[in-house]
Design a protein with these regions (language model features):
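Predominantly extracellular/luminal regions of secreted and cell-surface proteins
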Residues: 28-52
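Flexible, charged surface loops at secondary-structure boundaries
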Residues: 50-54, 74-77
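Extreme N-terminal basic, low-complexity initiation segments
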Residues: 2-7
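Acidic, glycine/polar-enriched metal-coordinating patches/loops
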Residues: 60-156
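Short carbohydrate-recognition loop motifs
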Residues: 54-60
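Short, surface-exposed charged micro-motifs
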Residues: 22, 47-49, 132
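Short sequence segments immediately N-terminal to proteolytic processing junctions that release a mature
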Residues: 8-36
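Intrinsically disordered, low-complexity boundary segments flanking structured domains
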Residues: 18, 41-49, 117-121
Length: 156
């Protein structure tokens, strides 16, 4: 077993002499349990910024219409993230679940199952939808795109 640290980069490699992430494990990994950060998103000028350096699980209260999501800091390679969207007590907020851009304003294509059938975010007050997205190339997300799936809609 090789355990290495990279001086000046705060990286640890297990079975790797040149770690490429904060923790780089070169082999099968078994965890008894794990948890993820959950980050609350906010709407500013009808845009929502999803910073993937802060979390991969996000919550959003739709208190205004959302015309775009801006993805910041996608890691290199494959990653996924989930957004739980809850309509506020007013409801009827439109959410452009298919309108993703990078920090520079470049459109990120979103691919949906079923031949590209775009889901409609539940507009009913206090109802919740869950959407997950995956990219296989975070470093080129504007060309690789996101693959979106509906985790569920109209939760009470």
């Amino acid at each position: 077993t090789v355990i290495a640290t990279q001086v000046g980069f705060s990286s640890v490699g297990i079975n790797s002499t040149a770690p490429t992430a904060t923790l780089d494990i070169g082999g099968h990994t078994k965890l008894r349990t794990y948890s993820e950060n959950v980050e609350a998103l906010s709407i500013v000028a009808n845009a929502v910024t999803v910073d993937l350096s802060k979390a991969q699980s996000f919550t959003l209260t739709a208190s205004d219409n959302v015309t775009q999501f801006v993805v910041q800091n996608p890691p290199t390679g494959s990653t996924s993230f989930t957004i739980k969207i809850t309509q506020d007590s007013t409801g009827n907020r439109s959410v452009g679940i298919d309108t993703f851009k990078d920090n520079g304003g470049v459109t990120i294509p979103v691919y949906w199952p079923g031949g590209g059938v775009l889901p409609i975010v539940t507009p009913t007050a206090n109802k919740t939808d869950i959407y997950s997205f995956r990219t296989f190339a975070g470093e080129s997300i504007t060309t690789a795109g996101l693959y979106g799936v509906v985790g569920g809609q109209n939760f009470a």
